[in-house]
């Protein structure tokens, strides 16, 4: 099979994998090396549906011994199959990088011949890139559950970020749709990677040139919409993953119908839950940067997010006792809870109010989004002049602000091969 045919098949087979961000790394270039994650390395470029397109996102092979119902590459799927040799993949990546098509590599693979054999092939491809071609750019590799821990260790020494897909939000759903996989087999490498990263950081603190293990951390991805779990269940799982496994990111992938399996939504009537995916990402942001907890955002009475407003606004509307916040006296944590105030603008407020009392005009200059924040804060004990605040009125105004986004059509995945313009 021609190399271009392999690339066409294996790039298309990888398009449903969302966990390909490249932030959080500072691997510097060397005179004898190629690429860098500083000046010329991992510039972020995202397609309309939020997926990173700055990396060559490809599978080593789409031949698989597993038969997961939700996966386009499952054993029983009638699709064209292909596989790169490690040398082919390394040469392809270097060629694309030299032509400035990509800033790095995102490498995953179906499991062919067992987890160990698949991981060994991935390791060889990355070894060629790092050692033979001197590639210093960003590499994100998918660790294969069930592989020998020593192989996972070797993979992490060659890659900048590792990830292990948790696949589905519950053990019950995993057993129904992916009977060849087990929760314990997925969580074991996540724990190993966590421990390896912590050990590596300790070694680097003592020895400057100690080998770095997955220096950009680890992430995971789960499919939403294929199974009946609520947003509360998903967000509680996310919180636990961040707390226990120290993940950098949890990615959410709206289920795309690829199968007529009886346990999955019927493709004819199913619409991918892209808005739900968006709300989960917004809530995830609140967990990571705004010091919210999953149990604060959703509860038994409200197990799913309101699709009409973002999670932060929804929380604010459900907790009127917290508001209004007086911007000239509130601490940092209270400011973060105000819709329209972000991490940067909250810090600016703390600095600016040392010099003089803040006004609404001043807040706008500091980057506060007043069209949302005005309903939840006061300056000098007063709301914005002329503003009338009532729960129903605030909700209507917030929904009106979201309406342009709610009316957008479903985004499409960009293609490497189709002609544009």
Residue ranges and their predicted role:
Residues 1-63, 369, 377-378, 382-408, ...:
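Flexible, acidic/Gly-rich N-terminal and inter-domain linker regions that tether
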Residues 55, 68, 107, 164, ...:
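Conserved, mostly hydrophobic/aromatic
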Residues 58-87:
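Canonical Radical SAM [4Fe-4S] cluster-binding loop centered on the CxxxCxxC motif
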Residues 65-67, 83, 96-106:
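Short, flexible active-site-proximal loops enriched in glycine and acidic residues
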Residues 90, 95, 113-297:
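Conserved AdoMet/S-adenosylmethionine-binding subsite of the radical SAM
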Residues 263-336, 372-421:
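Long, highly charged, low-complexity intrinsically disordered interaction regions
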Residues 352-353:
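Residue-level signature of tetratricopeptide-repeat
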């Amino acid at each position: 099979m021609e190399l271009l045919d392999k690339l066409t098949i294996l790039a298309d087979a990888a398009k449903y994998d969302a966990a390909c961000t490249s932030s959080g790394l500072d691997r510097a270039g060397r005179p004898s090396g190629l690429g860098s994650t500083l000046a010329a390395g991992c510039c972020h470029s995202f397609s309309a549906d939020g997926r990173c397109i700055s990396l060559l996102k490809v599978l080593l092979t789409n031949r698989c011994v597993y038969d997961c119902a939700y996966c386009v590459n499952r054993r029983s799927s009638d699709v064209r199959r292909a596989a790169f040799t490690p040398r082919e993949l390394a040469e392809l990546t270097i060629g694309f990088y030299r032509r400035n098509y990509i800033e790095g590599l995102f490498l995953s693979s179906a499991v062919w011949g067992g987890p160990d054999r698949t991981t060994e092939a991935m390791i060889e491809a990355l070894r060629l890139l790092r050692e033979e071609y001197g590639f210093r750019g960003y590499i994100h590799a998918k660790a294969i559950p069930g592989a020998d821990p020593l192989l996972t260790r070797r993979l992490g020494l060659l890659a900048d970020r590792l990830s292990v897909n948790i696949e589905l939000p519950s053990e019950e759903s995993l057993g129904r749709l992916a009977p060849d996989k087990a929760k314990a087999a997925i969580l074991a490498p996540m724990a190993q990677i966590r421990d390896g990263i912590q050990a590596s950081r300790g070694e680097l603190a003592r020895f400057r040139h100690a080998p770095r293990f997955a220096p950009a951390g680890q992430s995971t991805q789960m499919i939403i919409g294929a199974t009946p779990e609520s947003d509360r269940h998903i967000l509680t799982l996310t919180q636990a993953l961040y707390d226990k496994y120290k993940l950098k990111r949890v990615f959410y992938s709206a289920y795309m119908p690829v199968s007529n399996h009886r346990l999955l939504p019927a493709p004819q009537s199913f619409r991918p839950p892209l808005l739900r995916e968006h709300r989960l990402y917004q809530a995830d942001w609140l967990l990571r940067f705004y010091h919210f907890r999953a149990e604060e955002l959703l509860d038994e009475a409200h197990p799913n997010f309101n699709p009409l407003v973002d999670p932060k606004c929804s929380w604010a509307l459900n907790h009127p006792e917290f508001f209004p916040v007086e911007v000239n006296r509130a601490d940092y944590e209270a400011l973060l809870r105000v819709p329209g105030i972000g991490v940067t603008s909250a810090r600016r407020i703390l600095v600016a109010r040392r010099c003089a009392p803040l006004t609404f005009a001043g807040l706008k200059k500091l980057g506060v989004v007043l069209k949302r924040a005005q309903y939840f804060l006061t300056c000098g004990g007063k709301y914005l002049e002329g503003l009338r605040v009532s729960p129903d009125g605030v909700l209507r105004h917030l929904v009106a602000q979201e309406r342009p986004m709610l009316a957008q059509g479903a985004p499409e995945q960009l293609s490497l091969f189709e002609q544009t313009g």
